[in-house]
Amino acid sequence: MNSSLKDKLAVLPDKPGCYLMKNASGEIIYVGKAKVLKNRVRSYFTGSHNGKTQLLVSEIVDFEYIVVSSAIEALILECNLIKEHDPRYNVMLRDDKTYPYIKITNEAQPRLEITRKVLKDKAKYFGPYPNAGDASEVKKLLDRLYPLRKCRNMPKQVCLYYHLGQCLAPCVYEVSAEENQRLVDQISQFLDGGHEEMKQTLTEKMLQAAENMEFERAKEYRDQIKSIEAVMEKQKITFTDTIDRDIIGFAVEKGWMCIQVFYMRKGKMIERQTTSFPYYGSETEDFMSYVSQFYYDKQNALPKEILLPQESEPELLAEWLGIKVHAPKRGKKHELVKMATENARIALQEKFALMSKDDARTVQAVHNLGHILGIPVPHRIEAFDNSNIQGTEPVSAMIVFTDGRPDKKEYRKFKIKTVEGPDDYGSMREVVRRRYSRLLKENQPMPDLIVIDGGKGQISAAMDVLENELGLYIPVCGLAKDEKHRTAQLMYGDPPEPVNLRRDSYEFYLLQRIQDEVHRFVITFHRQSRTKTMLSSQLDEIPGIGEKRRKLLFSHFGSLKKMREATVEDFRQLGIGDKLAKEIIGHLRKLDT
Protein backbone atom coordinates (compact mmCIF):
# COMPACT_ATOMS: atom_id res chain seq x y z
CA MET A 1 0.00 0.00 0.00
CA ASN A 2 1.42 3.41 -0.96
CA SER A 3 1.87 6.12 1.68
CA SER A 4 -0.71 8.41 0.08
CA LEU A 5 -3.35 5.70 0.44
CA LYS A 6 -2.40 5.17 4.09
CA ASP A 7 -2.84 8.86 4.81
CA LYS A 8 -6.28 8.96 3.16
CA LEU A 9 -7.38 5.91 5.16
CA ALA A 10 -6.31 7.66 8.37
CA VAL A 11 -8.67 10.60 7.85
CA LEU A 12 -11.81 8.84 6.61
CA PRO A 13 -15.02 10.22 8.18
CA ASP A 14 -17.21 8.33 10.62
CA LYS A 15 -20.27 8.74 8.38
CA PRO A 16 -22.40 6.77 5.89
CA GLY A 17 -21.67 7.06 2.19
CA CYS A 18 -20.35 5.47 -0.99
CA TYR A 19 -16.73 4.80 -1.93
CA LEU A 20 -15.20 4.47 -5.39
CA MET A 21 -12.03 2.38 -5.72
CA LYS A 22 -9.57 3.30 -8.51
CA ASN A 23 -6.65 1.54 -10.19
CA ALA A 24 -3.35 2.99 -11.39
CA SER A 25 -5.02 4.37 -14.54
CA GLY A 26 -7.59 6.28 -12.51
CA GLU A 27 -10.34 3.88 -13.65
CA ILE A 28 -13.17 3.25 -11.17
CA ILE A 29 -13.02 -0.51 -10.64
CA TYR A 30 -15.39 -0.91 -7.70
CA VAL A 31 -18.21 1.03 -6.04
CA GLY A 32 -19.48 0.18 -2.57
CA LYS A 33 -21.65 1.58 0.20
CA ALA A 34 -21.05 1.80 3.93
CA LYS A 35 -22.90 2.70 7.11
CA VAL A 36 -19.53 3.90 8.43
CA LEU A 37 -17.06 4.80 5.67
CA LYS A 38 -14.06 4.72 7.98
CA ASN A 39 -14.64 1.12 9.04
CA ARG A 40 -15.71 -0.30 5.68
CA VAL A 41 -12.98 1.20 3.50
CA ARG A 42 -10.22 0.37 5.98
CA SER A 43 -11.41 -3.24 6.11
CA TYR A 44 -10.17 -3.79 2.54
CA PHE A 45 -6.60 -3.17 3.64
CA THR A 46 -6.56 -5.15 6.91
CA GLY A 47 -6.84 -8.86 7.56
CA SER A 48 -7.18 -11.64 5.02
CA HIS A 49 -9.63 -11.84 2.11
CA ASN A 50 -10.89 -14.44 -0.30
CA GLY A 51 -9.24 -14.69 -3.70
CA LYS A 52 -11.72 -12.43 -5.50
CA THR A 53 -11.51 -9.62 -2.93
CA GLN A 54 -7.72 -9.93 -2.74
CA LEU A 55 -7.55 -9.47 -6.52
CA LEU A 56 -9.59 -6.26 -6.20
CA VAL A 57 -7.43 -4.95 -3.34
CA SER A 58 -4.24 -5.64 -5.28
CA GLU A 59 -5.36 -3.17 -7.96
CA ILE A 60 -6.50 -0.33 -5.68
CA VAL A 61 -4.13 2.65 -5.68
CA ASP A 62 -6.62 5.40 -4.79
CA PHE A 63 -10.22 5.98 -3.77
CA GLU A 64 -12.73 8.75 -3.29
CA TYR A 65 -16.00 8.87 -1.39
CA ILE A 66 -19.30 10.71 -1.16
CA VAL A 67 -20.87 11.32 2.25
CA VAL A 68 -24.65 10.99 2.63
CA SER A 69 -26.91 11.23 5.67
CA SER A 70 -28.26 7.68 5.90
CA ALA A 71 -27.63 4.08 4.92
CA ILE A 72 -30.71 4.19 2.67
CA GLU A 73 -29.29 7.11 0.69
CA ALA A 74 -25.99 5.22 0.39
CA LEU A 75 -27.83 2.20 -1.03
CA ILE A 76 -29.59 4.20 -3.74
CA LEU A 77 -26.50 6.27 -4.61
CA GLU A 78 -24.49 3.06 -4.93
CA CYS A 79 -26.97 1.77 -7.51
CA ASN A 80 -26.77 5.01 -9.52
CA LEU A 81 -22.96 5.05 -9.46
CA ILE A 82 -22.67 1.40 -10.50
CA LYS A 83 -25.01 1.92 -13.44
CA GLU A 84 -23.09 5.05 -14.47
CA HIS A 85 -19.50 3.75 -14.19
CA ASP A 86 -20.00 0.01 -14.80
CA PRO A 87 -17.06 -1.01 -12.52
CA ARG A 88 -15.71 -4.40 -13.53
CA TYR A 89 -15.54 -5.77 -9.98
CA ASN A 90 -19.17 -5.00 -9.20
CA VAL A 91 -21.92 -7.56 -9.64
CA MET A 92 -24.24 -5.70 -12.00
CA LEU A 93 -28.02 -5.87 -11.85
CA ARG A 94 -28.48 -7.35 -15.31
CA ASP A 95 -32.26 -7.13 -15.13
CA ASP A 96 -31.86 -3.35 -14.66
CA LYS A 97 -33.83 -3.50 -11.43
CA THR A 98 -35.47 -0.22 -10.52
CA TYR A 99 -36.68 0.93 -7.13
CA PRO A 100 -40.35 1.28 -6.19
CA TYR A 101 -42.20 4.60 -5.96
CA ILE A 102 -45.48 5.66 -4.39
CA LYS A 103 -47.86 7.14 -6.94
CA ILE A 104 -50.93 9.36 -6.53
CA THR A 105 -52.92 8.66 -9.68
CA ASN A 106 -54.22 11.43 -11.91
CA GLU A 107 -57.90 10.40 -11.81
CA ALA A 108 -61.15 12.12 -10.87
CA GLN A 109 -61.08 9.99 -7.72
CA PRO A 110 -57.32 9.55 -7.11
CA ARG A 111 -55.79 6.64 -5.24
CA LEU A 112 -52.39 5.50 -3.98
CA GLU A 113 -50.44 2.69 -5.60
CA ILE A 114 -46.89 1.30 -5.73
CA THR A 115 -45.10 1.28 -9.08
CA ARG A 116 -41.59 0.75 -10.46
CA LYS A 117 -42.14 2.92 -13.54
CA VAL A 118 -42.23 6.72 -13.57
CA LEU A 119 -44.45 7.78 -16.47
CA LYS A 120 -45.32 11.20 -17.86
CA ASP A 121 -49.01 10.77 -16.98
CA LYS A 122 -49.48 13.87 -14.76
CA ALA A 123 -49.57 11.62 -11.69
CA LYS A 124 -47.42 12.43 -8.64
CA TYR A 125 -44.50 10.14 -7.79
CA PHE A 126 -42.58 9.92 -4.53
CA GLY A 127 -39.48 7.89 -3.76
CA PRO A 128 -37.58 5.85 -4.59
CA TYR A 129 -37.74 3.37 -1.72
CA PRO A 130 -35.00 0.79 -1.12
CA ASN A 131 -37.39 -2.13 -1.55
CA ALA A 132 -41.05 -2.97 -2.06
CA GLY A 133 -41.48 -3.72 1.64
CA ASP A 134 -40.55 -0.19 2.69
CA ALA A 135 -42.77 1.33 0.00
CA SER A 136 -45.64 -0.88 1.15
CA GLU A 137 -45.16 0.23 4.77
CA VAL A 138 -45.38 3.88 3.73
CA LYS A 139 -48.50 3.24 1.64
CA LYS A 140 -50.19 1.40 4.53
CA LEU A 141 -49.41 4.34 6.79
CA LEU A 142 -50.87 6.81 4.28
CA ASP A 143 -53.93 4.62 3.82
CA ARG A 144 -54.59 4.85 7.56
CA LEU A 145 -53.98 8.60 7.77
CA TYR A 146 -55.71 9.88 4.61
CA PRO A 147 -59.10 8.58 3.33
CA LEU A 148 -58.40 8.50 -0.41
CA ARG A 149 -60.15 5.93 -2.61
CA LYS A 150 -58.72 2.44 -1.99
CA CYS A 151 -60.34 0.16 -4.60
CA ARG A 152 -58.94 -0.07 -8.13
CA ASN A 153 -62.46 -0.61 -9.55
CA MET A 154 -65.43 1.17 -8.03
CA PRO A 155 -67.64 -1.27 -6.05
CA LYS A 156 -71.41 -0.82 -5.88
CA GLN A 157 -71.47 -0.47 -2.12
CA VAL A 158 -69.18 0.82 0.61
CA CYS A 159 -66.38 -1.47 1.75
CA LEU A 160 -64.65 -2.06 5.09
CA TYR A 161 -62.27 0.88 4.56
CA TYR A 162 -65.20 3.29 4.77
CA HIS A 163 -66.31 1.85 8.10
CA LEU A 164 -62.73 2.14 9.40
CA GLY A 165 -62.68 5.83 8.44
CA GLN A 166 -59.97 5.20 5.83
CA CYS A 167 -62.01 5.95 2.68
CA LEU A 168 -64.62 8.56 1.72
CA ALA A 169 -66.44 5.95 -0.42
CA PRO A 170 -66.69 7.84 -3.72
CA CYS A 171 -68.32 4.68 -5.09
CA VAL A 172 -71.51 5.63 -3.21
CA TYR A 173 -71.14 9.18 -1.95
CA GLU A 174 -70.20 12.28 -3.89
CA VAL A 175 -66.68 13.47 -3.09
CA SER A 176 -65.86 16.91 -4.48
CA ALA A 177 -62.76 17.70 -6.52
CA GLU A 178 -61.81 20.23 -3.83
CA GLU A 179 -61.88 17.56 -1.10
CA ASN A 180 -59.78 15.18 -3.19
CA GLN A 181 -57.28 17.95 -3.95
CA ARG A 182 -57.02 18.77 -0.24
CA LEU A 183 -56.13 15.14 0.51
CA VAL A 184 -53.64 14.98 -2.38
CA ASP A 185 -51.96 18.18 -1.14
CA GLN A 186 -51.73 16.81 2.41
CA ILE A 187 -50.21 13.53 1.21
CA SER A 188 -47.76 15.39 -1.03
CA GLN A 189 -46.72 17.64 1.84
CA PHE A 190 -46.29 14.58 4.07
CA LEU A 191 -44.08 12.77 1.56
CA ASP A 192 -42.06 15.92 0.80
CA GLY A 193 -41.01 16.26 4.43
CA GLY A 194 -44.11 17.59 6.15
CA HIS A 195 -44.58 14.40 8.16
CA GLU A 196 -43.12 16.20 11.19
CA GLU A 197 -46.33 18.26 11.35
CA MET A 198 -48.42 15.09 11.31
CA LYS A 199 -46.24 13.64 14.08
CA GLN A 200 -46.86 16.75 16.16
CA THR A 201 -50.63 16.49 15.62
CA LEU A 202 -50.66 12.79 16.54
CA THR A 203 -48.52 13.48 19.62
CA GLU A 204 -51.03 16.06 20.83
CA LYS A 205 -53.89 13.61 20.23
CA MET A 206 -51.99 10.86 22.06
CA LEU A 207 -51.41 13.06 25.11
CA GLN A 208 -55.04 14.17 25.11
CA ALA A 209 -56.27 10.56 24.86
CA ALA A 210 -53.99 9.52 27.73
CA GLU A 211 -55.27 12.40 29.83
CA ASN A 212 -58.83 11.21 29.14
CA MET A 213 -57.73 7.70 30.15
CA GLU A 214 -58.41 6.40 26.62
CA PHE A 215 -55.33 4.24 26.67
CA GLU A 216 -56.17 2.07 23.68
CA ARG A 217 -56.67 5.17 21.55
CA ALA A 218 -53.42 6.67 22.91
CA LYS A 219 -51.58 3.45 22.03
CA GLU A 220 -52.99 3.62 18.50
CA TYR A 221 -51.66 7.17 18.10
CA ARG A 222 -48.30 6.13 19.53
CA ASP A 223 -48.04 3.26 17.04
CA GLN A 224 -48.83 5.64 14.18
CA ILE A 225 -46.06 7.98 15.34
CA LYS A 226 -43.60 5.09 15.47
CA SER A 227 -44.64 4.00 12.00
CA ILE A 228 -43.96 7.48 10.66
CA GLU A 229 -40.52 7.54 12.27
CA ALA A 230 -39.70 4.07 10.97
CA VAL A 231 -40.61 4.55 7.33
CA MET A 232 -40.13 8.24 6.58
CA GLU A 233 -36.36 8.62 6.57
CA LYS A 234 -35.74 11.22 3.88
CA GLN A 235 -34.02 10.19 0.66
CA LYS A 236 -32.19 12.87 -1.31
CA ILE A 237 -30.30 10.83 -3.86
CA THR A 238 -32.96 10.56 -6.59
CA PHE A 239 -35.68 12.81 -8.02
CA THR A 240 -38.71 11.64 -9.98
CA ASP A 241 -38.81 14.55 -12.44
CA THR A 242 -35.84 13.22 -14.53
CA ILE A 243 -34.47 16.77 -14.88
CA ASP A 244 -30.72 17.24 -15.39
CA ARG A 245 -29.41 19.43 -12.58
CA ASP A 246 -26.12 20.39 -10.94
CA ILE A 247 -25.96 20.82 -7.16
CA ILE A 248 -23.10 22.98 -5.90
CA GLY A 249 -21.88 23.55 -2.36
CA PHE A 250 -18.73 25.05 -0.90
CA ALA A 251 -16.76 25.32 2.33
CA VAL A 252 -13.86 27.52 3.39
CA GLU A 253 -11.11 27.08 5.97
CA LYS A 254 -7.58 28.41 6.51
CA GLY A 255 -7.67 30.51 3.36
CA TRP A 256 -8.77 27.59 1.18
CA MET A 257 -12.07 26.99 -0.56
CA CYS A 258 -13.45 23.61 -1.58
CA ILE A 259 -16.30 23.37 -4.08
CA GLN A 260 -18.33 20.23 -4.69
CA VAL A 261 -20.45 19.82 -7.82
CA PHE A 262 -22.93 16.93 -7.80
CA TYR A 263 -24.19 15.93 -11.25
CA MET A 264 -27.78 14.69 -11.32
CA ARG A 265 -28.79 13.36 -14.72
CA LYS A 266 -32.23 12.00 -15.59
CA GLY A 267 -33.12 12.50 -11.94
CA LYS A 268 -30.23 10.35 -10.63
CA MET A 269 -27.02 11.48 -8.96
CA ILE A 270 -24.26 9.90 -11.03
CA GLU A 271 -21.04 11.85 -10.46
CA ARG A 272 -19.34 14.56 -8.45
CA GLN A 273 -16.41 16.91 -8.95
CA THR A 274 -14.25 18.29 -6.17
CA THR A 275 -12.04 21.37 -6.51
CA SER A 276 -9.90 22.96 -3.78
CA PHE A 277 -7.91 26.18 -4.12
CA PRO A 278 -6.69 29.17 -2.07
CA TYR A 279 -9.01 32.17 -2.23
CA TYR A 280 -8.16 35.81 -1.71
CA GLY A 281 -11.41 37.83 -1.78
CA SER A 282 -14.74 37.41 -0.04
CA GLU A 283 -16.11 33.88 0.23
CA THR A 284 -19.31 34.49 -1.73
CA GLU A 285 -17.67 36.55 -4.47
CA ASP A 286 -14.91 34.02 -5.06
CA PHE A 287 -17.43 31.17 -5.01
CA MET A 288 -19.66 32.86 -7.59
CA SER A 289 -16.58 33.74 -9.66
CA TYR A 290 -15.64 30.06 -9.74
CA VAL A 291 -19.19 29.00 -10.68
CA SER A 292 -19.29 31.57 -13.49
CA GLN A 293 -15.93 30.33 -14.82
CA PHE A 294 -17.08 26.72 -14.41
CA TYR A 295 -19.96 27.26 -16.85
CA TYR A 296 -18.16 29.75 -19.13
CA ASP A 297 -17.12 27.13 -21.68
CA LYS A 298 -20.12 24.82 -21.18
CA GLN A 299 -22.87 26.79 -22.91
CA ASN A 300 -23.76 23.80 -25.09
CA ALA A 301 -23.84 21.30 -22.23
CA LEU A 302 -25.76 23.07 -19.49
CA PRO A 303 -28.14 21.27 -17.13
CA LYS A 304 -31.76 22.38 -16.90
CA GLU A 305 -31.28 23.59 -13.33
CA ILE A 306 -28.48 24.62 -10.97
CA LEU A 307 -28.89 24.58 -7.19
CA LEU A 308 -26.66 26.87 -5.09
CA PRO A 309 -26.23 27.70 -1.38
CA GLN A 310 -28.44 30.41 0.11
CA GLU A 311 -25.63 32.95 0.48
CA SER A 312 -25.03 33.00 -3.28
CA GLU A 313 -26.61 35.31 -5.87
CA PRO A 314 -28.40 33.04 -8.37
CA GLU A 315 -30.29 35.76 -10.26
CA LEU A 316 -27.31 37.08 -12.24
CA LEU A 317 -26.13 33.58 -13.15
CA ALA A 318 -29.65 32.62 -14.27
CA GLU A 319 -29.86 35.72 -16.46
CA TRP A 320 -26.49 34.99 -18.05
CA LEU A 321 -26.95 31.24 -18.62
CA GLY A 322 -30.64 31.38 -19.49
CA ILE A 323 -31.54 28.43 -17.24
CA LYS A 324 -33.08 27.98 -13.80
CA VAL A 325 -30.67 28.78 -10.97
CA HIS A 326 -32.03 28.51 -7.42
CA ALA A 327 -30.80 28.85 -3.86
CA PRO A 328 -33.44 26.68 -2.13
CA LYS A 329 -34.29 27.48 1.48
CA ARG A 330 -36.17 24.29 2.35
CA GLY A 331 -37.24 20.92 1.08
CA LYS A 332 -35.44 18.20 -0.81
CA LYS A 333 -33.38 20.54 -2.99
CA HIS A 334 -32.13 22.40 0.07
CA GLU A 335 -31.07 19.08 1.58
CA LEU A 336 -29.10 18.26 -1.57
CA VAL A 337 -27.21 21.56 -1.39
CA LYS A 338 -26.52 20.87 2.30
CA MET A 339 -25.11 17.47 1.33
CA ALA A 340 -22.79 19.05 -1.27
CA THR A 341 -21.67 21.63 1.31
CA GLU A 342 -21.02 18.94 3.93
CA ASN A 343 -18.92 16.96 1.45
CA ALA A 344 -16.93 20.11 0.66
CA ARG A 345 -16.30 20.67 4.37
CA ILE A 346 -15.15 17.08 4.85
CA ALA A 347 -12.91 17.27 1.76
CA LEU A 348 -11.16 20.33 3.21
CA GLN A 349 -10.67 18.59 6.55
CA GLU A 350 -9.15 15.64 4.72
CA LYS A 351 -6.89 17.95 2.70
CA PHE A 352 -5.48 19.65 5.79
CA ALA A 353 -5.09 16.35 7.61
CA LEU A 354 -3.10 14.97 4.67
CA MET A 355 -1.05 18.16 4.37
CA SER A 356 -0.08 17.91 8.02
CA LYS A 357 1.24 14.43 7.35
CA ASP A 358 3.25 15.14 4.22
CA ASP A 359 5.63 17.93 5.35
CA ALA A 360 8.59 15.60 5.67
CA ARG A 361 7.81 13.86 2.40
CA THR A 362 7.47 17.16 0.56
CA VAL A 363 10.91 18.30 1.70
CA GLN A 364 12.34 14.91 0.77
CA ALA A 365 10.67 15.11 -2.65
CA VAL A 366 12.42 18.44 -3.29
CA HIS A 367 15.78 16.86 -2.45
CA ASN A 368 15.01 13.80 -4.59
CA LEU A 369 13.97 15.98 -7.54
CA GLY A 370 17.36 17.70 -7.46
CA HIS A 371 19.07 14.30 -7.42
CA ILE A 372 16.95 13.03 -10.34
CA LEU A 373 17.80 16.10 -12.45
CA GLY A 374 21.43 16.15 -11.34
CA ILE A 375 21.25 19.66 -9.87
CA PRO A 376 21.61 21.15 -6.36
CA VAL A 377 18.52 20.96 -4.14
CA PRO A 378 15.89 23.25 -5.80
CA HIS A 379 14.74 25.08 -2.68
CA ARG A 380 13.13 27.82 -4.80
CA ILE A 381 11.18 26.76 -7.88
CA GLU A 382 9.56 29.28 -10.24
CA ALA A 383 6.92 28.01 -12.69
CA PHE A 384 5.39 29.73 -15.74
CA ASP A 385 2.25 29.22 -17.82
CA ASN A 386 0.59 31.20 -20.62
CA SER A 387 -3.07 31.65 -21.52
CA ASN A 388 -4.96 33.13 -24.47
CA ILE A 389 -7.97 32.44 -26.65
CA GLN A 390 -6.96 32.43 -30.32
CA GLY A 391 -4.32 35.01 -29.52
CA THR A 392 -6.62 37.51 -27.80
CA GLU A 393 -5.89 38.93 -24.35
CA PRO A 394 -2.63 36.92 -23.97
CA VAL A 395 -1.34 36.73 -20.40
CA SER A 396 1.25 34.80 -18.45
CA ALA A 397 1.72 34.01 -14.79
CA MET A 398 4.48 32.83 -12.49
CA ILE A 399 4.19 31.04 -9.17
CA VAL A 400 6.86 30.21 -6.60
CA PHE A 401 7.29 27.06 -4.51
CA THR A 402 9.76 27.33 -1.62
CA ASP A 403 10.85 23.97 -0.18
CA GLY A 404 7.89 22.34 -1.85
CA ARG A 405 5.28 24.82 -0.59
CA PRO A 406 3.49 27.57 -2.55
CA ASP A 407 4.79 31.03 -1.64
CA LYS A 408 1.81 33.14 -2.71
CA LYS A 409 3.29 36.53 -1.89
CA GLU A 410 5.87 35.84 -4.62
CA TYR A 411 3.32 35.10 -7.35
CA ARG A 412 3.43 37.42 -10.38
CA LYS A 413 1.12 38.21 -13.31
CA PHE A 414 2.18 39.40 -16.77
CA LYS A 415 0.20 40.92 -19.61
CA ILE A 416 1.93 40.02 -22.87
CA LYS A 417 2.99 43.22 -24.65
CA THR A 418 5.18 42.34 -27.64
CA VAL A 419 3.55 39.24 -29.09
CA GLU A 420 0.61 39.27 -31.49
CA GLY A 421 -1.57 36.27 -32.21
CA PRO A 422 -1.40 32.78 -30.67
CA ASP A 423 2.40 32.52 -30.27
CA ASP A 424 3.07 30.47 -27.12
CA TYR A 425 6.84 30.34 -27.71
CA GLY A 426 7.00 34.11 -28.22
CA SER A 427 4.97 34.70 -25.06
CA MET A 428 7.31 32.43 -23.09
CA ARG A 429 10.34 34.32 -24.41
CA GLU A 430 8.86 37.67 -23.42
CA VAL A 431 7.86 36.72 -19.88
CA VAL A 432 11.17 34.95 -19.13
CA ARG A 433 13.05 37.95 -20.49
CA ARG A 434 11.03 40.41 -18.38
CA ARG A 435 11.23 38.35 -15.20
CA TYR A 436 14.96 37.62 -15.12
CA SER A 437 16.26 40.85 -16.63
CA ARG A 438 14.48 42.56 -13.74
CA LEU A 439 16.06 40.22 -11.17
CA LEU A 440 19.46 40.97 -12.72
CA LYS A 441 18.83 44.70 -12.64
CA GLU A 442 17.71 44.61 -8.99
CA ASN A 443 20.46 42.14 -8.03
CA GLN A 444 17.86 39.67 -6.69
CA PRO A 445 18.62 35.96 -6.10
CA MET A 446 17.77 33.59 -8.93
CA PRO A 447 15.62 30.45 -8.57
CA ASP A 448 17.19 27.02 -8.27
CA LEU A 449 14.87 25.56 -10.93
CA ILE A 450 12.45 26.94 -13.53
CA VAL A 451 9.42 24.84 -14.47
CA ILE A 452 7.71 25.53 -17.79
CA ASP A 453 4.18 24.36 -18.55
CA GLY A 454 4.89 22.77 -21.92
CA GLY A 455 7.21 20.54 -23.89
CA LYS A 456 10.41 20.87 -25.93
CA GLY A 457 9.44 24.07 -27.76
CA GLN A 458 8.62 26.07 -24.63
CA ILE A 459 11.69 24.77 -22.76
CA SER A 460 14.01 25.66 -25.66
CA ALA A 461 12.49 29.15 -25.94
CA ALA A 462 13.07 29.82 -22.22
CA MET A 463 16.63 28.44 -22.28
CA ASP A 464 17.52 30.49 -25.36
CA VAL A 465 16.53 33.75 -23.63
CA LEU A 466 18.26 32.84 -20.36
CA GLU A 467 21.56 31.68 -21.86
CA ASN A 468 21.96 33.64 -25.11
CA GLU A 469 20.35 36.95 -24.11
CA LEU A 470 20.84 37.20 -20.34
CA GLY A 471 23.88 34.99 -19.78
CA LEU A 472 22.10 32.99 -17.08
CA TYR A 473 22.44 29.25 -16.57
CA ILE A 474 19.41 28.19 -14.53
CA PRO A 475 18.08 24.62 -14.82
CA VAL A 476 14.84 24.55 -16.83
CA CYS A 477 12.44 21.61 -17.00
CA GLY A 478 9.05 21.24 -18.66
CA LEU A 479 5.84 19.42 -17.83
CA ALA A 480 4.05 17.97 -20.85
CA LYS A 481 0.37 16.99 -20.63
CA ASP A 482 -1.57 14.05 -22.07
CA GLU A 483 -4.72 14.14 -24.21
CA LYS A 484 -6.81 14.63 -21.05
CA HIS A 485 -4.74 17.68 -20.10
CA ARG A 486 -3.16 15.89 -17.12
CA THR A 487 0.51 16.05 -16.12
CA ALA A 488 2.10 13.19 -18.04
CA GLN A 489 5.84 13.68 -18.59
CA LEU A 490 8.82 15.53 -17.09
CA MET A 491 11.18 16.93 -19.76
CA TYR A 492 14.75 18.06 -19.03
CA GLY A 493 18.12 18.56 -20.70
CA ASP A 494 19.57 20.20 -23.81
CA PRO A 495 17.89 19.16 -25.98
CA PRO A 496 14.97 18.33 -23.64
CA GLU A 497 14.31 14.62 -23.23
CA PRO A 498 11.78 12.66 -21.13
CA VAL A 499 12.89 11.89 -17.57
CA ASN A 500 12.01 8.51 -16.13
CA LEU A 501 9.83 9.44 -13.15
CA ARG A 502 7.18 7.17 -11.66
CA ARG A 503 3.72 8.73 -11.78
CA ASP A 504 2.89 7.47 -8.29
CA SER A 505 6.04 8.99 -6.76
CA TYR A 506 5.97 11.97 -4.43
CA GLU A 507 8.31 13.83 -6.77
CA PHE A 508 5.78 13.50 -9.59
CA TYR A 509 3.01 14.59 -7.21
CA LEU A 510 5.03 17.71 -6.30
CA LEU A 511 5.46 18.63 -9.97
CA GLN A 512 1.78 17.96 -10.58
CA ARG A 513 0.84 20.33 -7.77
CA ILE A 514 3.12 23.00 -9.23
CA GLN A 515 1.62 22.61 -12.70
CA ASP A 516 -1.97 22.60 -11.41
CA GLU A 517 -1.32 25.70 -9.32
CA VAL A 518 0.31 27.76 -12.07
CA HIS A 519 -2.42 26.71 -14.51
CA ARG A 520 -5.14 27.70 -12.04
CA PHE A 521 -3.43 31.02 -11.36
CA VAL A 522 -2.98 31.99 -15.02
CA ILE A 523 -6.48 30.87 -16.06
CA THR A 524 -8.03 32.90 -13.24
CA PHE A 525 -5.98 35.93 -14.25
CA HIS A 526 -6.91 35.51 -17.92
CA ARG A 527 -10.63 35.23 -17.19
CA GLN A 528 -10.52 38.23 -14.90
CA SER A 529 -8.73 40.24 -17.60
CA ARG A 530 -11.15 39.11 -20.29
CA THR A 531 -14.22 39.82 -18.15
CA LYS A 532 -12.87 43.23 -17.18
CA THR A 533 -12.24 44.07 -20.84
CA MET A 534 -15.72 42.93 -21.88
CA LEU A 535 -17.43 44.91 -19.12
CA SER A 536 -15.25 47.97 -19.53
CA SER A 537 -15.79 48.12 -23.29
CA GLN A 538 -19.54 48.52 -22.84
CA LEU A 539 -19.03 51.58 -20.64
CA ASP A 540 -16.18 52.96 -22.75
CA GLU A 541 -18.66 53.53 -25.57
CA ILE A 542 -20.38 56.22 -23.47
CA PRO A 543 -18.89 59.74 -23.79
CA GLY A 544 -17.84 61.08 -20.41
CA ILE A 545 -16.92 57.69 -18.91
CA GLY A 546 -13.20 57.32 -18.36
CA GLU A 547 -11.20 54.83 -16.34
CA LYS A 548 -11.75 56.68 -13.05
CA ARG A 549 -15.53 56.84 -13.41
CA ARG A 550 -15.68 53.27 -14.70
CA LYS A 551 -13.93 52.02 -11.56
CA LEU A 552 -16.21 54.16 -9.40
CA LEU A 553 -19.33 52.73 -11.06
CA PHE A 554 -18.24 49.10 -10.68
CA SER A 555 -17.11 49.71 -7.11
CA HIS A 556 -20.53 51.11 -6.21
CA PHE A 557 -22.94 48.97 -8.28
CA GLY A 558 -20.91 45.78 -8.67
CA SER A 559 -22.34 44.79 -12.08
CA LEU A 560 -23.78 46.13 -15.33
CA LYS A 561 -27.12 44.55 -14.41
CA LYS A 562 -27.44 46.71 -11.29
CA MET A 563 -26.40 49.82 -13.23
CA ARG A 564 -29.04 49.03 -15.83
CA GLU A 565 -31.72 48.71 -13.13
CA ALA A 566 -30.61 51.83 -11.21
CA THR A 567 -32.41 55.18 -11.19
CA VAL A 568 -31.01 58.62 -11.90
CA GLU A 569 -31.07 59.30 -8.15
CA ASP A 570 -28.74 56.34 -7.55
CA PHE A 571 -26.06 58.00 -9.70
CA ARG A 572 -26.28 61.39 -8.00
CA GLN A 573 -24.56 60.17 -4.82
CA LEU A 574 -21.53 59.33 -7.02
CA GLY A 575 -21.36 62.88 -8.32
CA ILE A 576 -22.72 61.89 -11.74
CA GLY A 577 -25.16 64.37 -13.25
CA ASP A 578 -28.67 63.49 -14.39
CA LYS A 579 -27.84 63.83 -18.09
CA LEU A 580 -24.91 61.41 -17.96
CA ALA A 581 -26.86 59.05 -15.68
CA LYS A 582 -29.68 58.87 -18.24
CA GLU A 583 -27.16 58.16 -21.00
CA ILE A 584 -25.60 55.33 -18.99
CA ILE A 585 -28.97 53.74 -18.16
CA GLY A 586 -30.26 54.15 -21.72
CA HIS A 587 -27.11 52.74 -23.27
CA LEU A 588 -27.07 49.65 -21.05
CA ARG A 589 -30.78 48.98 -21.53
CA LYS A 590 -30.35 49.30 -25.28
CA LEU A 591 -27.55 46.71 -25.20
CA ASP A 592 -29.80 44.38 -23.22
CA THR A 593 -32.60 44.39 -25.79
UniProtKB/Swiss-Prot annotation:
Domain annotation GIY-YIG: ranges: 14-91
SUPFAM superfamilies xref list: C-terminal UvrC-binding domain of UvrB, GIY-YIG endonuclease, RuvA domain 2-like
UVR domain segment(s): 196-231
Principal localisation: cytoplasm
SMART domains associated with the record: GIYc (SM00465)
InterPro entries: GIY-YIG_endonuc, GIY-YIG_endonuc_sf, GIY-YIG_UvrC_Cho, RuvA_2-like, UVR_dom, UVR_dom_sf, UvrABC_protein_C, UvrC
One GO cellular component term noted in the UniProt record for this chain: cytoplasm
Signal peptide limits: none
Alphabetical UniProt keywords: Cytoplasm, DNA damage, DNA excision, DNA repair, Excision nuclease, SOS response
GO molecular function, one term: DNA binding
Annotated S-S bridges: none
Pfam families: GIY-YIG, HHH_5, UVR, UvrC_RNaseH, UvrC_RNaseH_dom
GO biological process: one example: SOS response
Source organism, top-level taxon: Bacteria
Family under the similarity heading: Belongs to the UvrC family.
Known role: The UvrABC repair system catalyzes the recognition and processing of DNA lesions. UvrC both incises the 5' and 3' sides of the lesion. The N-terminal half is responsible for the 3' incision and the C-terminal half is responsible for the 5' incision.
Subunit details: Interacts with UvrB in an incision complex.
Name of the protein in question: UvrABC system protein C
Gene encoding the protein: uvrC
